[in-house]
């Protein structure tokens, strides 16, 4: 079998690297090996890039398996991205079947919601008002929901006004013993009417969750700030110890309680984004830009085309990195920091976006590994003038090699997307210099070997 030159090069590349590392005298990369075939080891950062800001498609946001670390809830009023909202829809289930409410009278009802510090974004010194609504439309326990879906709501059943979220303040009002676990959470008072509604549900309808859900179709959790920029709060509804609705009632002169839990229930987040009049909104659909805009949740992604990649004939891609520089805009809010992680995705079929091979190589098939070998997180560097700048460096070595080897004219194979990760629980955004910026344009840094 005849081995191609490129295959031979890839096979011998580890040996080349070991040989170079063992030399005491510096030599050119690969000197002495394949010397008749390898012409040079080159660098360029001038490849043409076409960038287009696009609005995200809907995201699968159901958590039927109760594995989500948190859910976003709140409103952001961003000077460059407009207004973004996140509402939570959820079922509640009985903590145990067939509670005994015979001759019970209501004392009170409280909804406890645990905070997750990792997901908070914005200004937590701005007072928040959180509202709880009963659903008129059934939230199905056996269906998937997407981030653009809403369900019809009815009566407001609870409200906590003008509170300051304190996601770092840990306490435990349920267990005051010295060794008790502590967490940051809030207690939302629930109306007497809704508490009595729960008490009055027929005992037969509380023998199984599926029967109970026909009576309580679900709830919606929404929050609004007192003023800009507001904040996205992160609620860990799957913590059974600190997230539940507790019904306090009296029976036989004793005050008792019964819990309704989120854990084990279907729940999802709805995102809405109003870009009217915003800089980001005006950039949507444009592809010749000074500034680029990315946003998590159901926000914005970046489409990047490298149309002439296939014109690099007979090359081995040693390293390909997309370099993006964050832009500090006048009038921005310092609390709205750049996103912690960007990733590359590509189209599978016509509509589905999947992580690229370079991303998957770094984090592994379970998506639990480190991004160190891929990049995509903000780092501080010096520009040519010695000034500190913040950049993202994103590896696309394997993906770009596929572009180089591709046939001319297949623009789909030369197209990548940049998304904030993980999208449905990432409320942050990023403003980046675009391809037309005179000092810090987006660019592809390419190291390659000619054959």
Give residue spans per PLM region.
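Secreted, disulfide-rich extracellular signaling modules
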Residues: 2-15, 20-451
